[in-house]
Amino acid sequence: MRPSINLVVNALWLTSLSTPSVAAPSNGNYGLKGPELKHWPAQAAKALNKMIARNANNGRYAVFDMDNTSYQFDLEESLLPYLENKGVLTRETMDPALKLVPFKDTKKHKESLYSYYLRLCEIEDAVCYPWAAQIFSGFPLGELKGYVDELMAYNKTIPTTYFEDDKVTATEVSPPKIFEGQVELYNRLMANGIKVYVVSAASEELVRMVASDPKYGYNVPPQNVIGVSLFLKTKKGEITTARKQIEDGVYTQKTQKQNLDAEMTPWLWAPATWKSGKWAAILTYIDEWNRPILAGGDTPDSDGPMIFQGVDVARGGIHLWVDRKPAYREQIDGMIKNNTIAQKKEGLPVTADKNWVFVKPTELH
Protein backbone atom coordinates (compact mmCIF):
# COMPACT_ATOMS: atom_id res chain seq x y z
CA MET A 1 0.00 0.00 0.00
CA ARG A 2 1.22 3.48 -0.81
CA PRO A 3 2.09 5.36 2.41
CA SER A 4 0.03 8.40 3.30
CA ILE A 5 1.97 11.54 2.49
CA ASN A 6 -0.82 14.04 2.08
CA LEU A 7 0.94 16.61 4.22
CA VAL A 8 3.84 16.54 1.80
CA VAL A 9 2.22 16.61 -1.59
CA ASN A 10 -1.28 18.01 -1.43
CA ALA A 11 -0.13 21.61 -1.48
CA LEU A 12 1.23 23.09 -4.68
CA TRP A 13 3.46 25.45 -2.75
CA LEU A 14 4.85 24.36 0.62
CA THR A 15 6.60 27.10 2.53
CA SER A 16 8.82 26.89 5.59
CA LEU A 17 7.31 28.79 8.49
CA SER A 18 10.72 30.29 9.21
CA THR A 19 11.09 31.78 5.74
CA PRO A 20 10.76 35.59 5.81
CA SER A 21 7.90 36.84 3.70
CA VAL A 22 7.94 39.20 0.76
CA ALA A 23 4.92 41.46 0.55
CA ALA A 24 2.88 40.51 -2.49
CA PRO A 25 1.61 43.26 -4.81
CA SER A 26 -1.95 43.02 -5.99
CA ASN A 27 -0.94 41.74 -9.43
CA GLY A 28 1.54 39.17 -8.06
CA ASN A 29 4.30 40.52 -10.33
CA TYR A 30 6.55 42.12 -7.66
CA GLY A 31 7.77 44.70 -10.18
CA LEU A 32 9.97 42.11 -11.86
CA LYS A 33 11.69 42.54 -15.20
CA GLY A 34 11.42 40.15 -18.11
CA PRO A 35 8.48 38.22 -19.57
CA GLU A 36 5.45 37.49 -17.46
CA LEU A 37 4.81 33.86 -16.55
CA LYS A 38 1.71 33.59 -18.73
CA HIS A 39 2.09 29.89 -19.49
CA TRP A 40 2.03 28.85 -15.83
CA PRO A 41 -0.81 28.05 -13.44
CA ALA A 42 -1.58 31.12 -11.33
CA GLN A 43 -0.40 29.62 -8.03
CA ALA A 44 2.85 28.39 -9.53
CA ALA A 45 3.54 31.75 -11.18
CA LYS A 46 2.90 33.55 -7.90
CA ALA A 47 5.30 31.26 -6.02
CA LEU A 48 8.00 31.64 -8.67
CA ASN A 49 7.64 35.43 -8.82
CA LYS A 50 7.88 35.64 -5.04
CA MET A 51 11.09 33.62 -5.03
CA ILE A 52 12.59 35.66 -7.88
CA ALA A 53 11.76 38.95 -6.14
CA ARG A 54 13.46 37.78 -2.97
CA ASN A 55 16.63 36.65 -4.74
CA ALA A 56 16.93 39.15 -7.59
CA ASN A 57 20.34 40.67 -8.36
CA ASN A 58 22.02 38.97 -5.42
CA GLY A 59 24.42 36.46 -6.97
CA ARG A 60 21.94 33.58 -7.11
CA TYR A 61 21.36 30.97 -9.80
CA ALA A 62 18.88 28.30 -10.91
CA VAL A 63 19.47 24.86 -12.42
CA PHE A 64 17.20 22.96 -14.81
CA ASP A 65 17.14 19.57 -16.40
CA MET A 66 16.45 19.85 -20.14
CA ASP A 67 14.61 16.82 -21.60
CA ASN A 68 10.97 16.69 -20.46
CA THR A 69 11.64 19.57 -18.06
CA SER A 70 12.62 22.56 -20.18
CA TYR A 71 10.96 21.22 -23.31
CA GLN A 72 8.55 18.34 -23.75
CA PHE A 73 9.94 14.99 -24.93
CA ASP A 74 13.56 13.90 -25.36
CA LEU A 75 16.16 15.21 -27.79
CA GLU A 76 18.49 12.20 -28.02
CA GLU A 77 15.67 9.66 -28.01
CA SER A 78 14.06 11.37 -31.01
CA LEU A 79 17.23 12.36 -32.86
CA LEU A 80 18.37 8.72 -32.88
CA PRO A 81 15.42 7.30 -34.88
CA TYR A 82 15.26 10.48 -36.95
CA LEU A 83 18.82 10.01 -38.18
CA GLU A 84 18.42 6.27 -38.54
CA ASN A 85 15.36 6.75 -40.74
CA LYS A 86 17.37 9.17 -42.89
CA GLY A 87 20.08 6.53 -43.27
CA VAL A 88 22.61 8.89 -41.71
CA LEU A 89 23.20 6.93 -38.49
CA THR A 90 23.09 3.15 -38.76
CA ARG A 91 24.66 0.14 -37.10
CA GLU A 92 27.09 0.11 -40.04
CA THR A 93 28.17 3.73 -39.49
CA MET A 94 28.18 3.74 -35.67
CA ASP A 95 31.42 3.33 -33.76
CA PRO A 96 32.02 -0.44 -33.47
CA ALA A 97 32.97 -0.02 -29.81
CA LEU A 98 29.35 0.92 -29.09
CA LYS A 99 28.09 -2.54 -30.00
CA LEU A 100 27.95 -3.66 -26.38
CA VAL A 101 25.62 -6.63 -26.84
CA PRO A 102 24.46 -8.47 -29.98
CA PHE A 103 21.63 -6.96 -32.00
CA LYS A 104 18.33 -8.76 -31.62
CA ASP A 105 17.60 -9.52 -35.26
CA THR A 106 15.09 -12.03 -36.58
CA LYS A 107 14.71 -13.60 -40.01
CA LYS A 108 12.17 -10.91 -40.94
CA HIS A 109 13.29 -7.95 -38.82
CA LYS A 110 16.45 -5.93 -38.32
CA GLU A 111 16.56 -4.34 -34.87
CA SER A 112 16.51 -0.54 -34.83
CA LEU A 113 19.08 1.52 -32.95
CA TYR A 114 16.21 2.92 -30.89
CA SER A 115 15.27 -0.60 -29.82
CA TYR A 116 18.92 -1.37 -29.09
CA TYR A 117 19.12 1.72 -26.86
CA LEU A 118 16.01 0.66 -24.91
CA ARG A 119 17.48 -2.80 -24.35
CA LEU A 120 20.67 -1.23 -23.00
CA CYS A 121 18.48 0.73 -20.55
CA GLU A 122 16.99 -2.57 -19.39
CA ILE A 123 20.50 -3.64 -18.41
CA GLU A 124 21.24 -0.47 -16.42
CA ASP A 125 20.84 3.29 -16.77
CA ALA A 126 24.62 3.60 -16.44
CA VAL A 127 24.89 1.66 -19.71
CA CYS A 128 22.34 3.48 -21.86
CA TYR A 129 22.78 7.05 -20.53
CA PRO A 130 26.33 7.43 -21.86
CA TRP A 131 25.54 5.36 -24.96
CA ALA A 132 22.77 7.81 -25.92
CA ALA A 133 25.42 10.54 -26.17
CA GLN A 134 28.23 8.37 -27.56
CA ILE A 135 26.11 7.07 -30.46
CA PHE A 136 26.47 10.47 -32.15
CA SER A 137 30.26 10.17 -32.26
CA GLY A 138 31.83 10.53 -35.68
CA PHE A 139 29.73 13.56 -36.61
CA PRO A 140 31.15 17.10 -36.76
CA LEU A 141 29.22 19.42 -34.44
CA GLY A 142 28.19 21.63 -37.34
CA GLU A 143 26.54 18.70 -39.10
CA LEU A 144 24.77 17.63 -35.91
CA LYS A 145 23.52 21.19 -35.40
CA GLY A 146 21.86 21.04 -38.81
CA TYR A 147 20.12 17.79 -37.92
CA VAL A 148 19.00 19.13 -34.53
CA ASP A 149 17.44 22.16 -36.20
CA GLU A 150 15.68 19.86 -38.69
CA LEU A 151 14.34 17.78 -35.82
CA MET A 152 13.13 20.80 -33.85
CA ALA A 153 11.21 21.99 -36.93
CA TYR A 154 9.79 18.54 -37.64
CA ASN A 155 6.06 18.67 -36.95
CA LYS A 156 5.44 14.93 -37.11
CA THR A 157 6.26 11.95 -34.97
CA ILE A 158 9.10 9.63 -35.95
CA PRO A 159 8.23 5.99 -36.67
CA THR A 160 10.47 3.25 -35.30
CA THR A 161 10.26 -0.17 -33.67
CA TYR A 162 11.28 -1.86 -30.44
CA PHE A 163 10.80 -5.19 -28.71
CA GLU A 164 8.00 -5.63 -26.18
CA ASP A 165 7.70 -9.10 -24.63
CA ASP A 166 9.97 -10.36 -27.41
CA LYS A 167 7.58 -9.07 -30.07
CA VAL A 168 8.49 -6.41 -32.61
CA THR A 169 6.32 -3.41 -31.82
CA ALA A 170 5.81 -0.27 -33.88
CA THR A 171 5.95 3.07 -32.08
CA GLU A 172 6.09 6.80 -32.77
CA VAL A 173 8.62 9.08 -31.08
CA SER A 174 7.89 12.79 -30.65
CA PRO A 175 10.58 15.41 -31.28
CA PRO A 176 11.12 18.06 -28.58
CA LYS A 177 8.36 20.63 -28.17
CA ILE A 178 9.26 23.93 -26.54
CA PHE A 179 7.64 24.64 -23.17
CA GLU A 180 6.66 28.29 -23.51
CA GLY A 181 6.36 28.47 -19.74
CA GLN A 182 9.98 27.47 -19.24
CA VAL A 183 11.16 29.95 -21.86
CA GLU A 184 9.36 32.63 -19.84
CA LEU A 185 10.86 31.43 -16.57
CA TYR A 186 14.43 31.18 -17.89
CA ASN A 187 14.29 34.73 -19.23
CA ARG A 188 12.54 36.19 -16.20
CA LEU A 189 15.20 34.70 -13.93
CA MET A 190 18.03 36.12 -16.04
CA ALA A 191 16.33 39.51 -16.44
CA ASN A 192 16.37 39.81 -12.65
CA GLY A 193 20.01 38.91 -12.16
CA ILE A 194 19.59 35.19 -11.48
CA LYS A 195 21.86 33.04 -13.63
CA VAL A 196 20.39 30.00 -15.36
CA TYR A 197 22.26 26.73 -15.83
CA VAL A 198 21.17 23.57 -17.60
CA VAL A 199 22.36 20.32 -16.00
CA SER A 200 21.33 17.53 -18.34
CA ALA A 201 21.90 13.79 -18.60
CA ALA A 202 21.99 14.22 -22.39
CA SER A 203 24.89 15.15 -24.63
CA GLU A 204 26.12 18.58 -23.60
CA GLU A 205 26.81 19.66 -27.17
CA LEU A 206 23.38 18.56 -28.42
CA VAL A 207 21.56 20.31 -25.57
CA ARG A 208 23.62 23.46 -26.14
CA MET A 209 22.37 23.51 -29.74
CA VAL A 210 18.87 24.21 -28.40
CA ALA A 211 19.39 25.93 -25.05
CA SER A 212 21.87 28.51 -26.39
CA ASP A 213 20.42 29.16 -29.85
CA PRO A 214 18.41 32.42 -29.61
CA LYS A 215 15.78 31.17 -32.06
CA TYR A 216 14.53 28.70 -29.44
CA GLY A 217 14.17 31.43 -26.83
CA TYR A 218 15.94 29.97 -23.79
CA ASN A 219 19.00 32.21 -24.21
CA VAL A 220 21.21 30.19 -21.88
CA PRO A 221 24.87 31.26 -22.16
CA PRO A 222 26.73 28.38 -23.88
CA GLN A 223 29.14 27.97 -20.98
CA ASN A 224 26.15 27.47 -18.64
CA VAL A 225 25.03 24.30 -20.41
CA ILE A 226 26.35 21.25 -18.55
CA GLY A 227 25.75 17.72 -19.76
CA VAL A 228 27.36 14.47 -20.83
CA SER A 229 30.59 15.81 -22.27
CA LEU A 230 32.44 13.91 -24.98
CA PHE A 231 35.91 14.74 -26.24
CA LEU A 232 36.01 16.57 -29.54
CA LYS A 233 38.66 15.85 -32.17
CA THR A 234 39.73 18.94 -34.08
CA LYS A 235 40.79 19.05 -37.72
CA LYS A 236 44.39 19.15 -36.45
CA GLY A 237 43.85 15.85 -34.65
CA GLU A 238 43.88 17.44 -31.21
CA ILE A 239 41.32 16.49 -28.56
CA THR A 240 39.44 18.95 -26.43
CA THR A 241 36.02 19.52 -24.90
CA ALA A 242 33.95 22.59 -24.14
CA ARG A 243 34.32 21.91 -20.43
CA LYS A 244 38.12 22.06 -20.72
CA GLN A 245 37.95 25.17 -22.88
CA ILE A 246 35.68 26.87 -20.33
CA GLU A 247 38.01 25.90 -17.48
CA ASP A 248 41.01 27.22 -19.43
CA GLY A 249 39.23 30.52 -20.15
CA VAL A 250 39.40 30.09 -23.94
CA TYR A 251 35.74 29.33 -24.68
CA THR A 252 35.23 32.41 -26.83
CA GLN A 253 32.84 32.92 -29.73
CA LYS A 254 35.76 32.19 -32.05
CA THR A 255 36.45 28.91 -30.26
CA GLN A 256 32.78 27.95 -30.32
CA LYS A 257 32.71 28.54 -34.07
CA GLN A 258 35.84 26.43 -34.53
CA ASN A 259 34.24 23.65 -32.49
CA LEU A 260 31.59 23.25 -35.19
CA ASP A 261 34.27 21.67 -37.37
CA ALA A 262 35.39 19.32 -34.59
CA GLU A 263 34.16 15.74 -34.58
CA MET A 264 32.39 14.15 -31.64
CA THR A 265 34.26 11.16 -30.22
CA PRO A 266 32.90 8.38 -27.97
CA TRP A 267 35.29 9.25 -25.13
CA LEU A 268 33.64 10.56 -21.98
CA TRP A 269 34.63 13.50 -19.79
CA ALA A 270 33.77 13.41 -16.07
CA PRO A 271 31.75 13.89 -13.93
CA ALA A 272 28.90 12.04 -15.59
CA THR A 273 25.84 14.28 -15.39
CA TRP A 274 23.09 11.90 -14.35
CA LYS A 275 21.74 10.94 -10.92
CA SER A 276 24.24 11.96 -8.20
CA GLY A 277 26.51 13.17 -10.99
CA LYS A 278 24.19 16.14 -11.51
CA TRP A 279 24.93 17.37 -8.01
CA ALA A 280 28.63 16.61 -8.60
CA ALA A 281 28.48 18.73 -11.76
CA ILE A 282 27.03 21.66 -9.81
CA LEU A 283 29.84 21.40 -7.26
CA THR A 284 32.45 21.04 -10.00
CA TYR A 285 31.34 23.64 -12.52
CA ILE A 286 29.12 26.15 -10.72
CA ASP A 287 29.84 26.56 -7.01
CA GLU A 288 30.79 24.36 -4.06
CA TRP A 289 28.90 26.41 -1.47
CA ASN A 290 26.45 28.78 -3.13
CA ARG A 291 23.42 26.57 -3.71
CA PRO A 292 20.74 27.13 -6.39
CA ILE A 293 17.55 28.94 -5.48
CA LEU A 294 15.65 26.72 -7.92
CA ALA A 295 16.24 23.20 -9.20
CA GLY A 296 13.86 21.75 -11.78
CA GLY A 297 13.43 18.21 -13.05
CA ASP A 298 11.02 15.46 -14.07
CA THR A 299 12.79 12.12 -13.49
CA PRO A 300 13.16 10.96 -9.86
CA ASP A 301 16.29 8.82 -10.24
CA SER A 302 18.17 11.21 -12.50
CA ASP A 303 17.02 14.61 -11.19
CA GLY A 304 16.28 13.73 -7.56
CA PRO A 305 19.82 14.15 -6.17
CA MET A 306 20.20 17.60 -7.75
CA ILE A 307 16.81 18.72 -6.52
CA PHE A 308 17.05 17.41 -2.96
CA GLN A 309 20.71 18.26 -2.34
CA GLY A 310 20.73 21.55 -4.14
CA VAL A 311 17.88 23.90 -3.34
CA ASP A 312 18.62 26.73 -0.90
CA VAL A 313 15.33 26.59 0.97
CA ALA A 314 16.54 29.10 3.56
CA ARG A 315 16.45 31.73 0.81
CA GLY A 316 13.00 30.67 -0.33
CA GLY A 317 14.38 28.36 -3.01
CA ILE A 318 11.97 26.20 -5.00
CA HIS A 319 11.92 22.50 -5.82
CA LEU A 320 10.28 22.56 -9.29
CA TRP A 321 8.74 19.32 -10.55
CA VAL A 322 7.31 18.75 -14.04
CA ASP A 323 4.72 16.11 -13.21
CA ARG A 324 4.63 14.04 -16.41
CA LYS A 325 4.00 10.49 -15.15
CA PRO A 326 1.85 9.14 -12.29
CA ALA A 327 4.54 6.56 -11.50
CA TYR A 328 7.19 9.27 -11.29
CA ARG A 329 4.94 11.42 -9.11
CA GLU A 330 4.48 8.52 -6.72
CA GLN A 331 8.22 7.93 -6.69
CA ILE A 332 9.13 11.56 -6.02
CA ASP A 333 6.47 11.73 -3.30
CA GLY A 334 8.11 8.72 -1.67
CA MET A 335 11.52 10.36 -1.93
CA ILE A 336 10.15 13.51 -0.28
CA LYS A 337 8.83 11.44 2.60
CA ASN A 338 11.96 9.33 3.02
CA ASN A 339 14.37 12.25 2.71
CA THR A 340 12.35 14.24 5.25
CA ILE A 341 12.59 11.34 7.71
CA ALA A 342 16.34 11.00 7.05
CA GLN A 343 16.98 14.71 7.62
CA LYS A 344 15.07 14.65 10.90
CA LYS A 345 16.94 11.52 12.02
CA GLU A 346 20.30 13.18 11.40
CA GLY A 347 19.29 16.42 13.11
CA LEU A 348 19.63 18.37 9.88
CA PRO A 349 17.47 21.28 8.74
CA VAL A 350 14.37 19.72 7.19
CA THR A 351 14.17 20.98 3.61
CA ALA A 352 13.06 17.94 1.59
CA ASP A 353 9.35 18.67 2.03
CA LYS A 354 9.53 22.46 1.67
CA ASN A 355 8.76 24.80 -1.21
CA TRP A 356 7.60 22.44 -3.94
CA VAL A 357 5.94 23.59 -7.14
CA PHE A 358 4.30 20.83 -9.21
CA VAL A 359 3.20 21.55 -12.77
CA LYS A 360 1.83 19.36 -15.56
CA PRO A 361 3.46 19.44 -19.02
CA THR A 362 0.17 20.61 -20.57
CA GLU A 363 0.19 23.63 -18.24
CA LEU A 364 3.49 24.88 -19.69
CA HIS A 365 2.20 25.27 -23.26
Q: What does each model-identified segment do?
A:
Residues 3-15, 20-66, 74-100:
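Non-catalytic pre-domain segments flanking phosphatase-related domains
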Residues 21-25, 114-124, 251-255:
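Short, compositionally biased low-complexity segments
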Residues 24-37, 42-43, 59, 146-197, ...:
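C-terminal cap/substrate-recognition subdomain and adjoining C-terminal extension
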Residues 51-53, 68, 215, 284:
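Short, flexible, glycine/charge-rich loop motifs used to bind or transfer phosphoryl groups or to couple energy/partner
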Residues 64, 68, 296-298:
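Active-site flanking residues adjacent to catalytic metal/cofactor-binding acidic residues
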Residues 71:
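Mobile, glycine-rich extracellular loop/lid and propeptide segments
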Residues 74, 126-127, 205, 276:
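A generic alpha-helix surface/boundary motif
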Residues 75-79, 83-84, 89-173:
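A metal-dependent, Asp-based hydrolase signature
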